[in-house]
């Protein structure tokens, strides 16, 4: 039951962020979210409010946190529930609880930051996962499709990024702005190892992403790098990072990327590191919308951050 509640919370969390405006869009979160699926009943349901959706997600995760085992192989464990709670609380603007849950996982001694930057999306031999992975969709190199688990993006996600063919022109590419930011510091391994300019210096120049060139990618839905970023942001927002503990987390990520340490930490620093560290992991849009809720940005690519185009529309046959 605890594993099922964790998966239900994870599913509701991903879906509500795609199909509804963010938490905080209305003062009481009475704006429409998604139909809540809490039973096997196939009867179409009306959309619940975002407040109700997040309340269900939080309760499912608190139940899972209490009942999941400390160790559970490749399946969800107690720390996975805590890690997802940290992400949910960050989305809700509950920075104190987000920081606390991130700290519980980081201080558990169960996980450690992988010293090799590229290991997060390398080929892992049948479940031999990096020490920073908290909850992962595991893929194998077996020929049977039933032996391979993929996330909601499916194989088309990684194949539309692949850059390991020199003649490749993938469907999904980096923007010029991101490429420039990622490669601005020539010591940054993220820029060196994850991007390549093709047709450089010509009008047809474009930028491929090499982050997902592995054949059997394990998809790290929850990992320690993200929690470092959550902790650092929350500490800045709560107390200006007065104790320097957020700075230490950001510098750990920077050191792994080959960069020198920062001497102080601002919110801009944290969000910049998040963009570079989690690029193309399905994170950026939701962070921008979260910053829109907080009044820190007004537009995304020239349009209002909360315009209808920033959420997917429900099909006509769905109860709305």
Feature-to-residue mapping (PLM):
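TPR-repeat structural position
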Residues: 54, 95, 241-243
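Aromatic-anchored glycine-rich loop motif in surface-exposed flexible loops
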Residues: 1-71, 245
